[in-house]
Design a protein with these regions (language model features):
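GGW-centered surface loops in extracellular recognition modules
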Residues: 295-352
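Short consensus segments that form the blades of beta-propeller domains
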Residues: 78-84, 422-425, 522-524
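Sec-type signal peptide cleavage vicinity
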Residues: 5-311, 359, 364-390
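An exposed tryptophan-centered "aromatic clamp" motif
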Residues: 411-430, 436-513, 536
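Residues that flank catalytic or metal-binding motifs in active/ligand-binding sites
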Residues: 88, 177-179, 340, 429, ...
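Short aromatic-cysteine micro-motif
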Residues: 336-432, 436-449
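Residues within well-ordered beta-strands of beta-sheet-rich folds
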Residues: 130-132, 182-184, 343-345, 430-432, ...
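Short, structured beta-strand segments at or near domain termini in extracellular proteins/domains
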Residues: 494-496, 519-537
């Protein structure tokens, strides 16, 4: 049986108590609608005055975690008043212009219906009406509050209406008090296996109880503490598709975390386990989005962690670093191995014109003792500089191939590559024709190919050609990939290698438009291929 409070001249809402006559032509009845969590809004664009919605955590070695927090598109379809409402107890409060509580109804919804006796009799005036579901606490002193345990289910509706004395219906839109957060991982390469992470806020300022001001319709922390969500598993995106520009993984269970509104959140995400990504361990790494976030009630937030790779470059003065710190320096080469201290030129040599390797390979070749087998493991140290610039790197022990534009054009044009700027770094080697080691390093450490034992005898191997393209173009370079939109999927670009195999002839790097690479070979002395220079720093 519903209690009815009739507002009188006093401030006591219990001045008159009884059940209203449902046939009366006076009084206020109520209807409820229950919308889902709100629609998407990128933080910093609408209501939140953020200067920056993205924060970056440096994981080292050029791996960055770009963390953003945005409002997501939710199901904004509002349940019509005639649709089934959530069963339970509802409390309706009426406050006058001075903020005094004038009336209160405790009503129960069964099978989606309010009792016809749930009517409030009020004197003509303007009132603030507030409706609470049974997950909202109302103290004897009139304090409205919600605990963290009820963040997912507590709802409050509020509206201001003028009562004239005739029968009227006041509609409530019952919004969620809490907000929900889901986490998504994004990367330029496949999300690896065994990735687990959890969100938390250990600042000590997370609301564990939130108080609601019915007059202003605002929330404030009633009690604060810490928050720790459950560990979530992020499925791998696989290991066979290398063609996408981005790979996304979201947990299949525990999709949402529910929190109370917060004017200054410091939510973070910590990886608790996971295989390597970009050759970097994830476990133990913590990602922090933009601090002091305003988390609003009834909102759906996406905490997106974008794991990106930025590369180091060799600059004109011989220094090495990231583009973000380049200042007035000019990049001339992309670092492919910090172990071998090697880098690849940003553009093709010889203005992109193909040439032969040497005119007579029997005469102008590498030393016979230095011919590897196509099945040999590719060495960690490149011989390219030696074969290009040392007389001892030639078969006859006399010829310096770097100085022979007619006899050894591939070596010559690599050795005389012009990066377009004056190079002043005294620590830099001369430019050279890259060997199999250099091309393998490009495949593994820039293209993030997965065959760590790749050699000239290997079958074609895929790499992340979008990452390759970005690494070159970010620095104003020309990618080694085939970007011709009219080319067929098996169209390729061929680059010379400085390596000559005893059972495979001259090495080539085949780069197919479909994202595959292949350490191939050239048999004919008339074969033409492109030239890309390399350098040591």
């Amino acid at each position: 049986m519903a209690s009815v409070f009739v507002g009188c001249s006093g401030n006591d809402p219990a001045d008159a108590i009884g059940n209203a006559d449902p046939t009366t032509d006076q009084g206020v009845s109520f209807s409820l609608t229950e919308p889902d969590f709100g629609e998407e809004e990128t933080m910093g664009v609408r209501s939140c005055n953020w200067k920056n919605a993205v924060d970056t955590t440096d994981l080292g070695d050029g791996v960055l975690g770009e963390v953003s927090m945005s409002k997501e598109q939710g199901d904004i379809t509002t349940r019509a008043a005639t649709r089934t409402l959530s069963n339970g107890r509802y409390t309706v409060l009426a406050y006058d212009a001075s903020g005094s509580l004038k009336a209160k109804i405790n009503a129960t919804v069964v099978s989606g219906e309010f009792s016809s006796k749930d009517i409030m009799i009020l004197e003509p005036a303007t009132y603030t009406f507030v409706c609470l579901n049974d997950k909202v606490d109302l103290s004897e002193g009139g304090v409205i509050s919600v605990s963290q345990a009820n963040a997912a289910t507590a709802r409050i509706g509020r509206t201001v209406k003028s009562v004239s004395g005739t029968r009227m219906k006041v509609p409530f839109v019952m919004y969620h008090v809490g907000l929900r957060v889901r986490v998504s991982l994004e990367a330029m390469v496949n999300i690896p296996n065994n990735v687990k992470a959890m969100i938390f806020d250990d600042s000590g300022n997370t609301p564990t109880v939130t108080n609601y001001d019915p007059i202003t319709g605002t929330y404030s922390a009633g009690a604060v503490g810490t928050f720790s969500g459950p560990e979530e598993i992020f499925p791998s995106t696989g290991s066979t598709d290398f063609t996408k520009e981005k790979y996304i993984s979201s947990p299949k269970s525990n999709t949402y975390h529910y929190l109370l509104p917060n004017q200054s959140s410091s939510i973070q995400l910590k990886f608790t386990s996971g295989d390597q990504i970009y050759h970097k361990d994830l476990a133990g790494r913590t990602m922090t989005p933009y601090k002091n976030m305003v988390l609003e009630p009834n909102a759906t937030y996406l905490l997106n962690v974008k794991l990106t790779k930025v590369f180091k470059y060799v600059f004109d003065d011989g220094t090495v670093g990231f583009l973000r710190n380049k200042g007035t320096r000019k990049p001339i080469a992309l670092v492919i191995s910090e172990t071998d201290r090697s880098a690849i030129a940003l553009h093709d040599a010889n203005n992109g014109v193909q040439t032969i390797w040497t005119v007579k390979r029997n005469d102008y070749n590498n030393p016979v003792a230095e011919y590897p087998s196509q099945r040999d493991q590719i060495p960690a140290t490149s011989q390219g500089l030696h074969w290009t610039w040392d007389a001892s790197g030639s078969k006859d022990g006399i010829t310096i191939k770097a100085n022979e534009p007619v006899k050894c054009p591939a070596f010559y044009h690599a050795a005389h590559y012009d990066p377009g700027v004056v190079v002043t770094g005294t620590n830099l080697s001369k430019w050279y024709l890259g060997a199999n080691t250099d091309w393998k390093n490009l495949y593994l450490y820039v293209g993030f190919g997965t065959n760590t034992k790749v050699n000239a005898n290997s079958s074609p191997c895929p790499w992340y050609y979008h990452v390759i393209d970005k690494a070159f173009t970010d620095a104003g370079g020309t990618t080694v990939s085939n970007t011709d939109p009219n080319a067929s999927s098996n169209a390729l670009r061929k680059y010379w290698s400085a390596t000559y195999y005893r059972d495979f002839d001259t090495g080539l790097m085949h780069i197919f438009k479909n994202g595959y690479t292949d350490g191939n070979h050239s048999i004919s002395e008339r074969d033409l291929a492109l030239i890309r220079a390399f350098i040591h720093y």
